[in-house]
Each structure stands twice: as C-alpha cells, then as structure tokens.
Amino acid sequence: METLQMKEAALVYLDRSGGLQKFIDDCKSYNDSKQSYAVYRFSILIDPCDVVELDADLGNHILHHPLKAARVFQSVCFVAVKTLSLIGQLQTETQINIVLKLTHLPALPSYTLDLCEFPLNYASQRFYMMQGIVIAMTTITKYTQGARFLCSDGVCPLSKGFQYVRVHVPGATESATVRNDFLCSLCSSSLQEDRKFRVLGDKQIVEIITTKMFHAFQGDSKNQPFRFQSLGIFLRDELVNKMKIGNEYKIIGIPVCVKTSQTALCVEANNITPHTAKVPLGISDNFRRLLSLTSSSCWKFTAMLANVFASQIVAPGTYNLLKLCLLMSLVQTRDCNREREDCLDILVITSDTLLVDRLLNFSMNLVSRGIRHPVCTEVFPTVSRNKYGTGAVSIQAGSALLAKGGICFIGDLTSHKKDKLEQLQSALESRSVTVFIPGKKFGDDFDQQMTFPIQCSFWSFVDMDSSSRRNVQKTSTLIGQMDCSLIPANLAEAFGLLINCSEASPCHPLLPTVQHTLKKAVEPEGLLYLASKQFTTEDFEKLLAFAKSLNMEFSLEAERMIHGYYLASRRIRTDSIHGSKLSASALKYLVSLSEAHARLSLRTTVLREDALIAALLLEISLTLRYGATPFCVAPNALFPFELYNEEYLEQRDLYLTQCQQQLQQFIATCGPGTTVFSSDE
C-alpha cells in the first residue's frame, strides 16, 4: 500500500513538474529510431523540497534511499510507456534505467560532506553535498551503461527476451555490471552476454580538494594544522567535461568505496553546479571617508592606498611603487569561471629578497586564489597514471592552474631550471599551456595533447645580490637601462611589469625599513602604525573584492591616449636591424593597467588620467629593459614626493599633470597620425 502511494505521488510530481512531458518526448526519440535497445535511459530532474511537500515518504526515499526511489519511478515510467504505447520495442520493466537528478539538497549539516572532517560517513549510500576545487582530471573512457544477458540453455524460456538486463548503479564497478559468473534463476545455467546489445557511456574521474586546503599553499604559518585529502569524483554521461581544472564546484553525489591497490573514498556525481563567490556590497567606512576626501582628484585615492597598504610588512610610505602595482594586479584577478585574459604579471628586481618575499606573500593572501608555488611541485600541469585503475591518464593541475582567477607567486626566478623558465615564458606569451600525452607510455594507440588556458597573474622576483655574485654585471651605455643578464631577455619581456626595488632605486628607502624591522622585532604582533588600525587587512580584502566586481568601460580620451602612446613608443623603439622592441602584447598591458587603476579608484569609466598611470608604469619598465626615450620618465615618476600630508598630494597631482602634458607632446611628436585632444577641445 505504501509503495502504491509513492507511485501515485511520483506520477503526480512528474505531471506537475513537466517531467512527464519530457519523458514522453524522450520516448518518442527512442521510438522514432526504430532500433531495439537493451536499456532505455531517462534522466528525471527532481526538486527534493517539492517532492517532500507532495509526499514525505517519497521525499525521504529520494534523499536517503535513492536506489529504491529510482525503482519507484522506474515502475511508474514503465506503466506510462505501456499505457500510452510510447516505445513499441520495449518488452520488460528492467529495460528502463531511471536516473534521478537532484537540483539541490536541504541546507542541513547532515547532508554536507566536509573533506576536512573525520570520520567521513560514506556507508549510508545516500546523497551528500560537497564543495571543492578540481586539482586533477582524467581523459574520457568508456563504461558499460547496460547489458543484456541470455540463458545459455537453449531450451530455457529465459534464453530469449530481455528478462536479464543489468544496468550501472551509483558506486558499482564494471565487474558488477558485466562478468561471466551470472546464473539463470530458473535453470541455474550460466548466463551469456548478448554483446550486440551492450550500451556504453562516457566516464571521467576528477579529483577535488576543499577550499580550506588552500591555506597550505599560502605560506601562512599562523594557521593551525588540519587534515585534508583529495576526493575522487566519478562523472558519467552528460556530466563528462562539465568540470574544469582550477574551477570550484558544488557537487551532489553518493559516496562509495573503490578498492584498487588501496581502498579509496570516491563520489558518484549526480549533479554539479559552478560555485559563485559572493560579491561584497561595498567598502569599509574608513575607505569610504578616504574616497570622499580625495574625490577632487583621480590620483589621490590610489596614492593613499599604496601609501598605507601592507603596513604590517613595510613602513607606510615605503615601496609605494611596488605596492601600487601589486594592488593593481590584485584587482585584475577575476572569478575563475569567467574566460578573461587581462592579468598583470609582475617581476621585481631587488637586493632585499626577504622583505619583498614577505610583501608579495602578504599581498597574495588578500585574494581567495593566491598560491605560493611549493618548490617540490610543478608550476604547470603534469601527466601520470590514474590511481583508480580505469586505464585513463590523469592530468595534475600544477600551481598555475590551481591559481586560476588569482595569483601564482613563484618566488625567486633564478631558483627555477632553464626548461621550466622556457615553459614559463611560453605560458606568459600565449596565456596557455599544452600537455602532451604519449600513447605508447600509457597503453594507447595514439598520442594526445590537451591545452589549458592560463588565467592567473604570475609574481616573481630576481635577487640582485646573487646576480652580482654569479656574474660580473655589465655596464649599460643607455640611460636608465638596468642589467638583467641573470634572466633571459625574452622572459623579462614576457612579464608585463618590471619593478626595480634594488638599493639604488627610489623604491628602496633604507632608514624607514631599518626602523620598521627594529620595531617589529620588539613587537612582533603589535600594530606599529595608525594606518594598520584604520585600514585593516579585512578592509583591503573587502575593497579588492568590491573593485574586482565593477564593470568597466573606456572613455574616448583614454582610448586615444593609450593607442597614441603605444604607437609613438613602438616607433621610437624600432631599429632597422632588430625591428621594434615593443611587442604587440604591450598594448594589452596598457589597456589592463588603465582598467586596473580605474578599478582601484572605484570608478566604472577608464579616464585619460588612468591611461597616464598605465603609460608611466609601462615606460618605467621599458626604460629598465631598453633605456630611456624622449618621453624620459623618472624612476620615481608616480611617487615623486613622500606623502606626508595634503600639500604633498597636491604637489604630486601637479607633477602628474605635467607628465600628462609631456605625454601628449611625446605622442604628437613621435606618433604621426594620432590625435590627442586637450580638455577644452
């Protein structure tokens, strides 16, 4: 009686939800094919809340006994097929394979599988929801979705028809569906598979880790030790290729144990949805007040941000150029589910690697996908054998793909081997990496290759002290040019920004750094400056998250200035032997830098003031590589004065206004065919 009531409820739900009409349409497709199948597979979308409201018993079966619930729907669908004559070829109920796809699970702790908790409840054979980031995935292989068996005794009535049909159920291995020791229930003779009726489906395995685990990659020693492990997710049929390496997903599935060389916990996925991070509604009150006080200028707010940023690591007012570039790189990070390529890569030349390392590590942790590349692992994807014994090849993410939509901090550039640097240069130039899969090595007839987009910004630094010890520095004959002989010139060019923080640069104030170090030694956990109390790390995290969410558009003046500077700079840096020293990617960096400064200023329109900052930053980098041009930008052009009070901010604005006029003159002189309008025009 209870089963009959659940069947009635299932039919009512299918009718109300539109599932019955979809089922009829699917049946029509099977019937029109005029082909006889061993298994007819139907996917039914289920909203657990709606089912529970309709019938509590059926809802309970769907949530806690999904295999029994599937049999209820199987019976209902079989009756519907026979009553309405939907599929003429269908003979038995066992031929119908019902897959219940859940839209969601109740928001209760008992339905959540936390990969950091122990023990994991995986024996109940019911649905759980888990959330994680894909760190590895296999190539696609086939599995047996369903098979038809016949009694080997020709006299037996079951030697014909579709009485023995086996279908894959969640958690079952291939041998559970197809093997040679099945016996006939009528005469006990062995069953033989009718191979022409075998139905194959696609299968893929991905590995995920919980988001909490990212603390292990961020170099934050304050975090307490915790347990985590990767979890294998089996994707089948329509779910194959729905997950990408580096992306974060919410997964509904049934935990199972797979016994290979060792028992491994896996999940048979039922439904997957991309995880979307929540965007903060605004910024902190202190930043809001600062924005209001500096609203008369397009440059003051970002100058103050750079001035007070990371006061836990360096004294306010020091390393301002580097801090501004870091903030601009951070606001250009994006939700990893968006396909964007406006990253800002930064290479720092320094003689104080410890301080720069701390500063970059601190900044990286302000975004959710900040990865500090461990020396013992690979930056880019690698190939290995699949540990689940399915014959597929497993592709491991590497730090670059794990940092998708964020920052990949690879440390000292000189610590990497030559082949890795060449791979890095290729990835920076193409924003993609290709993985080669040799077929002979992994038991396949053909070689394969897979290409993955690189959607993170790379940060690195070069130790000038090690450079002077290993090589005799070359004396440059060009004004402003710096010796970067320790790293290949093409690799240095592939980084969008080259920042000089050596002792000779204005970005390396010695006395404030010494004072800060001494204060920090006395009070390691203390807030040494008022700025640390007024603008906390949480305030900066909120500011960056809000700035990243802004939708930007370019003003006509900004576009003209960007294109004008690019053409003029490209023309002036061209010689008859080597051609232009300015690559086509420089235009992309100019656009990205302009957008980043406008975003950091919390504006939705890129102005020519933002284009000026972009041009100055790129010109400083180009001068370090190739020497100065008639534009002649000073190394400290963005911060010519120490920002003590409002008067110094005003002087900086006047200086930048002069730089803007100088840039317009440079464009007019060296970039023929480019029009730059004054504010009056």
UniProtKB/Swiss-Prot annotation:
Keywords associated with the record: DNA damage, DNA repair, Meiosis, Phosphoprotein
Tissue specificity: Predominantly expressed in the gonads and the brain. Not detected in the heart, lung, nor embryonic fibroblasts.
Any single Pfam family the record assigns to this protein: MCM_lid
Domain of life: Eukaryota
Disruption phenotype: Mutant mice are viable and show no overt phenotype. However, both males and females are sterile. Males fail to produce spermatozoa, and formation of primordial follicles is disrupted in females.
Domain MCM: 533-621
Gene Ontology molecular function: any one: DNA binding
Cysteine disulfide links: none
Gene3D superfamilies the record matches: P-loop containing nucleotide triphosphate hydrolases
Biological processes, Gene Ontology terms: double-strand break repair involved in meiotic recombination; late meiotic recombination nodule assembly; meiotic recombination nodule assembly; oogenesis; spermatogenesis; synaptonemal complex assembly
Modified-residue entries (Phosphoserine), positions: S292
Role, per record: Plays an important role in meiotic recombination and associated DNA double-strand break repair.
Name used for this protein in its record: Minichromosome maintenance domain-containing protein 2
Naturally occurring in which organism (per UniProt): Mus musculus
Gene name as annotated: Mcmdc2
